[in-house]
From Swiss-Prot:
Coiled coil: none annotated. Homodimer. Its EC number is 2.1.2.1. Its main location: cytoplasm. InterPro entries: PyrdxlP-dep_Trfase, PyrdxlP-dep_Trfase_major, PyrdxlP-dep_Trfase_small, Ser_HO-MeTrfase, Ser_HO-MeTrfase-like, Ser_HO-MeTrfase_PLP_BS, SHMT-like_dom. The modification N6-(pyridoxal phosphate)lysine is found at residue 230. (6S)-5,6,7,8-tetrahydrofolate binds at residues 121, 125-127, 354-356. This is Serine hydroxymethyltransferase. It comes from Prochlorococcus marinus (strain SARG / CCMP1375 / SS120). It catalyses: (6R)-5,10-methylene-5,6,7,8-tetrahydrofolate + glycine + H2O = (6S)-5,6,7,8-tetrahydrofolate + L-serine. The gene is glyA. HAMAP family: SHMT (MF_00051).
Length: 419
């Protein structure tokens, strides 16, 4: 007879085994995917709680279901902490993802066929910023700006000219693979010139923004969206922020009933825990270490003769341009995976290769910094990556690299306290 009191190992040994295998993989690999991080055990405890049982359509104290008094308190804590963290007057913590946060903004501000302007995906933008394969590029007239061909950084006069020519109703500033600081004030000036809304998608840099390691878009943008994982180190989910409470009500309605039903209150509780962690001084220390580590990683890789897009980084992202060593991103990704390093192939600006092959490799320092890596350890990581990429056919070097990775994993253990 089935009982809800049976644990996972007894109820479903197959899933239990696979979860433990994934834990082992995370513990024995170096995680350099820029969009990933390691949530705390407290965050995971909240997400795996009895809150998963509760339906709570609506907002705190305005629900369509009974029995929400504790849910209301939890969600209000998440809202208040998010407002404090980002100095925002309004927040909605219900979006299931960053993509759904963006769609809620589109629903609130746009009509099908309106013109939107975002960063070109191949230059570091995101699918939801108007890519033709995404609903944002199918429902709206999407135009794009990119980086300067020489410097590989944003050229605001070029962006201004694109905006003046096309006069979009919404400008999106944000990225998934841009390693430099975003000047939100400059974007605001362009948006004001054409009377456009301005959306900042800070999914990758939210943790940096929260701690003052990157400028805050809230004072300059009409609305801000983000994920709650990545550099914020929370559960996988979305968040919408706004500097004006009345304007924010548009997005409340766009989230529910606009494009979601019941919120995931177990995830919202985990968001609240993560926001609470991010408000502590040690998280600020962590965030600045993330950036220092990225700079050390980029510098060492350049010293080994591999080019870096824009010649460096201001955040957690290091984007390798592998044309400098006549290698594709697909090949590089495969090589480092053989020595237990996970990253991802990525297009670089003006990439001659297809998105399935690419000329780039995107690295991020957030996850390994959570494990305790500092600059010295990241120099070791850079050398392992360079050794792999510069000696693709040397099996002895490959074995040495894998041994170094295992040593680094042992020196900086993950989730070892209760395992």
């Amino acid at each position: 007879m089935h009982t809800i009191n049976s644990d996972l190992r007894n109820t479903d040994p197959d899933i239990s085994f696979l979860i433990n295998q994934e834990l082992l993989r995370q513990q024995t690999h170096l995680e350099l995917i820029a969009s990933e991080n390691f949530a705390s055990e407290a965050v995971m405890e909240a997400q795996g709680s009895v809150l998963t049982n509760k339906y709570a359509e609506g907002l705190p104290n305005k629900r369509y279901y009974g029995g929400c008094e504790h849910i209301d308190a939890i969600e209000q804590l998440a809202i208040t902490r998010a407002q404090t963290l980002f100095n925002a007057e309004w927040a909605n913590v219900q979006p299931h993802s960053g993509a759904q946060a963006n769609f809620a903004v589109f629903l609130a501000l746009l009509n099908p066929g309106d013109t939107i302007m975002g960063m070109d995906l191949s230059h570091g933008g995101h699918l939801t910023h108007g890519s033709p394969v995404n609903v944002s590029g199918k429902w709206f007239n999407a135009i794009h700006y990119g980086v300067d061909q020489t410097t590989k950084v944003l050229n605001f006069e070029q962006i201004r000219q694109v905006a003046l020519k096309n006069r979009p109703k919404l400008i999106i500033c944000g990225f998934s693979a841009y390693p430099r600081t975003i000047d939100f004030k400059a974007f605001r000036s362009i948006a004001d010139e054409i009377d456009a809304y301005l959306l900042a998608d800070i999914a990758h840099i939210a943790g940096l923004v929260a701690c003052g390691a990157h400028p805050n878009p809230v004072p300059y943008c009409d609305v801000v969206t983000t994920t709650t994982h990545k550099t914020l180190r929370g559960p996988r989910g979305g968040l919408i922020l706004c500097r004006d409470k009345e304007f924010g009500k548009r997005f409340d309605k766009a989230v529910f009933p606009g494009n979601q039903g019941g919120p995931l209150e177990h995830v919202i509780a985990a968001k609240a825990v993560a926001f609470g962690e991010a408000l502590k001084p040690e998280f600020k220390t962590y965030t600045f270490q993330v950036i220092s580590n990225a700079k050390a990683l980029a510098k060492r890789i350049q010293e080994r003769g591999i080019s870096i897009v824009s010649e460096g980084t201001d955040n957690h992202i290091v984007l390798l341009d592998l044309r400098s060593i006549e290698m594709t991103g697909k090949k590089a990704d495969s090589l480092i995976s053989e020595v237990n390093i996970t990253a991802n192939k990525n297009t670089v600006p003006f990439d001659p290769e297809s998105p399935f092959v690419t000329s780039g490799l995107r690295l991020g320092t957030a996850a390994l910094t959570t494990r305790g890596f500092t600059e010295k350890a990241f120099i070791e990581v850079a050398d392992v990556i360079a050794d792999c990429l510069l000696n693709p056919e040397d099996l002895s070097i490959k074995e040495q690299c894998k041994a170094k990775v295992i040593d680094l994993c042992n020196r900086f253990p993950l989730y070892n306290s209760n395992q």
